[in-house]
């Protein structure tokens, strides 16, 4: 019975862990050695000082390769690290303002939004209302529409201006190149 406290590790099928009656073996150079028993393949791998690694379990018969497992594992980890470096998750950056914003402040917000969009992030443009300002929601909509037209070359509107509580917001996403 397996120990429930210790998580079962998914050990790679190499050398003695390969439990099939017959396997197709590929040499370290890529040449096929044919269909042989795992014991014969292990002897060949031991002679060369290499490991027998299960490559494809689903094939009939399963495919194994003679290689240096430590080097193979290192290469796989290196590829995974490189892939992780290259992927960029699109964050949602927020640009907040009031509907009575001055021109210079508005330009600062536009430049912020452009910088976020160039970095590949989505932008949430929010207009906050205080007190009775909520009566002027049409002015906030005009402001967000103006922002959308000013950013038309850099962004697509993901969600049109919409009022939510004491805020009006719009989502912009970077244009696909």
UniProtKB/Swiss-Prot annotation:
Pfam families, A to Z: IF3_C, IF3_N
Query: What quaternary arrangement does the UniProt entry report?
Result: Monomer.
* BP-aspect Gene Ontology terms: ribosome disassembly
Per the UniProt record, the lineage of the source organism begins with: Bacteria, Bacillati, Cyanobacteriota, Cyanophyceae, Synechococcales
Q: What is its main location?
A: cytoplasm
Q: Which UniProt keywords apply?
A: Cytoplasm, Initiation factor, Protein biosynthesis
The protein in question is named Translation initiation factor IF-3
Taxonomically, the superkingdom here is Bacteria
Gene Ontology molecular function terms on file: ribosome binding; translation initiation factor activity
Q: Give the family, as the similarity comment puts it.
A: Belongs to the IF-3 family.
**UniProt subcellular location:** Cytoplasm
């Amino acid at each position: 019975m397996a120990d429930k406290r210790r998580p079962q590790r998914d050990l790679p099928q190499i050398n003695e862990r390969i439990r099939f009656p017959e396997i197709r073996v590929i040499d370290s150079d890529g040449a096929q050695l044919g269909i042989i028993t795992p014991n014969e393949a292990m002897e060949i791998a031991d002679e060369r000082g290499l490991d027998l690694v299960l490559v494809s379990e689903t094939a009939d018969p399963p495919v194994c390769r003679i290689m240096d497992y430590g080097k193979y594992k290192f290469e796989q980890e290196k590829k995974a690290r490189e892939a992780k470096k290259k992927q960029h998750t699109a964050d949602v950056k927020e640009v907040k303002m009031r509907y009575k914003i001055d021109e210079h402040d508005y330009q600062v917000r536009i430049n912020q939004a452009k910088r976020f969009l160039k970095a590949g992030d989505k932008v949430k443009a929010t207009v906050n209302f205080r007190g009775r300002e909520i009566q002027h929601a049409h002015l906030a909509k005009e402001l967000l529409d103006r922002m959308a037209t000013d950013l038309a070359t850099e962004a697509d509107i993901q969600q049109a201006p919409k009022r939510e509580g004491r805020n009006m917001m719009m989502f912009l996403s970077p244009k696909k190149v």
